[in-house]
Every structure is written in C-alpha cells, then in structure tokens.
Amino acid sequence: MKAAITTTAKYLPEEIMSNQDLERILDTNDEWITTRTGIKERRILRDPKKATSYMCTEVARQLLEKRGISADEIDLIIVATMSPDMLFPSTACLVQGNIQAKNAWGFDLSAACSGFVYGLYTGAQFIESGNCKKVMVIGADKMSSILDYEDRTTAILFGDGAGGVILEAANEEGYGVLDARLYSDGLNGREHLLMPGGGSLHPASHETVDQHMHFIQQDGKQVFKAAVIAMADVAEEIMQRNNLTAETIDWLVPHQANQRIIHATAERMGITEEKVMMNIARYGNTTAGTVPICLAELDEQGKLHKGSNLVLVSFGAGYTWGGVYVRWQ
C-alpha cells in the first residue's frame, strides 16, 4: 500500500518585491539578478504579526476545503521549515491548534530547502505502515525574517511562501509515492550555507546581533557547484532505479533555487524545457515551499493526470538533497 497525494494547496503573500525594488536598497540591478538566477520578483509577508505558521495554516485550511474533509480526520501534520515562528513549540503544533485538528499529532522537520522532499517521504511511511490514514505535509518559510537586506548575495534570492499536500493510501497498485533517495553531507556542507546565530552554540546576544549571525550566510559558488552535481545525480539515480526515461517522465519538479541549476538538472536527465516546472521568476526561492508550490500550480492548471510520472528533486543546507518518484493517482 503506497501513499498518494490526494490534494494540493499553496499560499503566497500578496506583496511583491521586484528586482527594481532591490535596486533601491542594494548595489545590484535587474539584469544582473535575472541573468544569474532567473528571478524577477518574490513575495514578502510584511506583517510582523504573521509568521510561518500563518502561511502554513492558510495552506492547511485550503487542503481541508479542497478535499472536503474536517480537521478531525487528519492524523498527522508534518511541517518542513527552517524559519519556525519560534524554536518551540513546533510550527506543526501551532497549525494543529489553529485548524483544531484534535486527533492529529505533529512535528517540524528541518532539512532547509530539501525539507518538503524529506517530509513527503517521511509522511508516506506513516501511510504505508497503516498507522495513519491522512497525513498533511506542508513546506513553508518566511525567508524575509532571516535575510540581511544589506547582503546582495542572499537578499536577491529568497521569498516567502508555503505549499502542502494531503497523503492518503493509493487507490490502486503502482500509483503514489513509489521511490525516494535522500542524502546528507554534514562534513562538507555545514560551513557553506547556514544561519549561525540563535542556537545553543551561539545563543542570541548583543555580539551575535552585531555580527549579523541571525541571518543566512552562504558561499554562493560552493553551494551552486554542489547543488548542480547533487540534484542531477539524484535525478539520474531515480530514473535508473525506476526504469524511467526522458520520454516517460511527464514532469520534473525541481527545487527553485536557481534557473541555471534547474537547467543543468534537466539537461542531465535529457528532459526538454516543456517538462520542467519553473516559477522561480515569480517567487524566487521559498526554500521548503518551492516544490509543493510547484505541485499546487501544476494541479491548478490541470497538468497532472492519472499516471503522470513526476520526479521531485531538491538540494539544501546541510548539505541535504534528495529525489522522489511520484506516479499521480
């Protein structure tokens, strides 16, 4: 018994921050950003009283409405995020309380940009084991809350957003979440993409704030190089393990980190541009939100049909990366 995605949903804040907006506060320009990343604009959740749990709750409510079920029917809520409202309680618990899912338990999963891919496969295990009937998996980040808008190497890349799915047992054999390969490399990845402040190693202090340690820090060249190799490798591995070809794959759904990384992954798979889901130009990198937002948009546009073969791939801080093969129910 495999787990199948039965519902998708997304939430993007209304406010748009364009490249032209960034030109006013950073030493950069639209052409430079677009050429190197493919990003034209991103969404920002400006309200200081609204955080990641707000976006997750909006997604959760949409999922329930679309599926036509009550919150009481949800057994488990997994939230993938690296920008929780607070260290504890978990964002998943906040969402559970907000939608009053009284029969659900939940937890947060921290795998940065790979979070949703990790969460999807994790959630699928609870369906396959028979311990849960309905699992909600949400990927969300309020990246604007941890961005240094004086640092053009990171400020141009990220936006705010959330997406999610409901997992249930597949109706037929051969459909649903059929395979996954997940990886980590904490030896080589830990120093290249991180937010050093706020944890038990560097708890908040005047010094950590003054040194901008509560913002994302990254070595862009190292991360780019690692991401290109890892995403392409895991995509190729998923294809080989499941006898998939460029012709039989209907959609590559990649993490929206950088247009060049996405193109390199598609090229390695031999997949044409028409089969690659990309919305990075409109939303930037919403980290854990990218893949589920892409799924929701494909679903909304009627591009997912019974039997559609999807390969989901992602890469994030850690390093973490992975791929999931889904055959749409």
Swiss-Prot record:
Record-linked InterPro entries: ACP_syn_III_C (IPR013747), ACP_syn_III_N (IPR013751), FabH (IPR004655), Thiolase-like (IPR016039)
Biochemical pathway: Lipid metabolism; fatty acid biosynthesis
Reaction catalyzed: malonyl-[ACP] + acetyl-CoA + H(+) = 3-oxobutanoyl-[ACP] + CO2 + CoA
Enzyme class, spelled out: transferase
Protein name: Beta-ketoacyl-[acyl-carrier-protein] synthase III
Entry-linked Gene3D superfamilies: 3.40.47.10
Bilayer-crossing regions: none
Domain notes: The last Arg residue of the ACP-binding site is essential for the weak association between ACP/AcpP and FabH.
EC number: 2.3.1.180
Record organism: Chlorobaculum tepidum (strain ATCC 49652 / DSM 12025 / NBRC 103806 / TLS) (Chlorobium tepidum)
Paired cysteines (S-S): none
Function: Catalyzes the condensation reaction of fatty acid synthesis by the addition to an acyl acceptor of two carbons from malonyl-ACP. Catalyzes the first condensation reaction which initiates fatty acid synthesis and may therefore play a role in governing the total rate of fatty acid production. Possesses both acetoacetyl-ACP synthase and acetyl transacylase activities. Its substrate specificity determines the biosynthesis of branched-chain and/or straight-chain of fatty acids.
